[in-house]
Amino acid sequence: LNFYTLCVIYLVYSFLGWVGETVVATIKGRQFTNRGMASGPFCFVYGTAGVLLAVGLADLRTNWLALFAGSFLIATVVEWVTAKFLERVHHRRWWDYSGKKFNLDGYVCLQYSVLWGVLGAVSVRWGNDLLLRLCAVFPPLLFHIAVWVSMSIAALDQISAAVVVERYAAKHPRLEQLGQELGKGKSRLQQKIAASVERRIQKA
């Protein structure tokens, strides 16, 4: 593994993650839904996890149990940190597992952590080797140029998306304030309903 092959792992897994997320969301919503965090076909949380797994678990490739456990742990931490960061930056949740069993803050849950553990183990055991063999097919100079161009496009895409979100938030400060007011109103309504029900029970 070197800088260029890690970039390939980052880009490929970001793209595959986007494909998987978009297909599932499109099927559920019955219309095309771009699940990327930017306008391009990337879900960078998958690429980040892929690189960390490739670097951190390379020595465990022959130990399936340790490989699964490491993938489970690393992917879960990456998912939680990413979800928390995105909510802080964009003021909304990109995914919410609150309705699933064994979830933590709605950011991660056991069901998907097990899935990430399995997929991570498969990627480290076989997927990365396949990518390295494909990279070796291209002439070094052409390969390096392609990596730099692809990484530049991905970086610009992510930066432009962040700029658009910040500008939109700056032009519409009332949206966040309105969301907070609605949340407070909902809490007050719930309290009134609970008090009303309690009074009726006492009268009965």
Give the label of every model feature segment:
Residues 1-204:
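Aromatic-rich, lipid-facing transmembrane alpha helices and their immediate juxtamembrane interface loops
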